[in-house]
Amino acid sequence: MNSLTVPIGLPIEIKKSGAPDTQGLILQEFKYPFVAKKYNLFEEEKRLVWPESPEWELELIDTLNWSLEKAIKEFRNEKVNQKQKEQNLDNYHMTDYKSHLHIKEFDIISRLVLDNFCPKEHNFRTEDCWGALYRKGHYIQTHHHWPSALSWTYYLKTSPNTEPFVFVGQEKEYPIYPEEGDLIIFPSVMNHRVSVSQTDDERIVIVGNIR
């Protein structure tokens, strides 16, 4: 398949009572030129257009990766921990879903992805961006990111021993074995998962949703 028509769930209106107006749910569609795409930011580094930022002058992927890993490992927030437990996501460490709004490194990586790898004909913006750290015993159940339009996962740290990123189709599964620096972009409607890690090697990723 060379292209895919992707439904986009737009924000719904809220009634005066505070309840969502589900009848007001609007769907748009856009033609995406591929089902999933993988890049490596180390290989793409020379052609990247970096966002202007007075707080970030070093246009080096290696430096950005180091800063992102540090930010993820140092992140602590009781509200995020509680939300993870409520969503049964407490088997790994993560930052909050809006990290791009208050952590400069997340803002930089989200803008790099949006400006360099996403379709220009749509007025997309980053809706969510967060970091996650997985160790032995950690996993991700099958899920999707709709109603976002596109989603992406960027691999800060991984090894040949970590579990693959798996797209789950109706009849078969499609594993991807990422390397450090790999960026996977895909329509948010695509189901995906990661099996239970059997290694002590860390897997550290940044995840983003675009709408």
Region annotations inferred by a language model:
Residues 3-122, 139:
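Non-heme Fe(II)/2-oxoglutarate
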Residues 122-196, 202-205:
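Catalytic core of non-heme Fe(II) oxygenases with the double-stranded beta-helix
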